[in-house]
Amino acid sequence: NMSAMLIAEYILGQKRANNTMPENPVLVESIVSTDMAKAIAKAYDVELVEVLTGFKYIGEQMLKYEKSGEKNYVFGFEESYGCLPGTYARDKDAPAAVCMLCEVAAFYKSQGKTLWDGMIDMYEKYGYYREGIATMTLKGIDGAAQIQQIMDRARQSTPAKLGAFDVLAVRDYKADTRKDLKTGEVTATGLPSSNVLYYELSDNAWCCVRPSGTEPKIKFYVGVKGDTLDGADQMLEELKAEVLKHFE
């Protein structure tokens, strides 16, 4: 998440400085990636599009934009170390991402700063966004059944709170619904069907729950926004613990 944000900030900053920002620019990220991307996109007047986990969905957006000509892809990423700083491919490109990060490092070095200094600058500019993952491993046939039971129970009963945070809305990507818990309004997510639940929480926090596609695990992605780095890290660890406790 942090390396992707450093690259995104650099790309958008350079395009603005050199007047090379395309019309209708778009950043694309997976739903489990950092919410700092929303703040960066807003600062540069760039649209942010969210897709399901898996870089193929970012590739689909690129193809869609190329065919329609209505939008221009600028940068795409997912939290699991996947980035693509161009439209020449349809999958994540690690060598290109590393080269971009080296360019970002050189940019900050020219100012007497490190990459970490640059990240601190971004935290101070956009807020202290922190993200993490908690997992439960449930092996074998029984484990697979247990994982599905956890997802079924979660769909049947929505908590009012997760830790210190109120649950504001729930997105069920399997049912293609987003329910606002205050108004009761239900709208479509607009994304393909997937066995994923996403909880929008108070104070810019969130939690996303999904079974792993490659391991006998259920994954709990969480994100928070704090006023300080230490404060955000503490909030994150507390939320991870409360989420595991709730879904056990």
Regions found by a protein language model. Name each.
Residues 1-2, 13:
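Hydrophobic, small-residue-rich alpha-helical packing segments that form membrane-like cores
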Residues 6, 14, 18-210, 219, ...:
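Phosphate-binding and adjacent anionic-ligand microenvironments
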Residues 10:
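Active-site activation/catalytic loop segments of kinase-like enzymes and analogous catalytic loops
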Residues 213-215:
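A generic beta-sheet turn/junction motif
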Residues 223:
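Active-site beta-strand/loop architecture of penicillin-binding DD-peptidases
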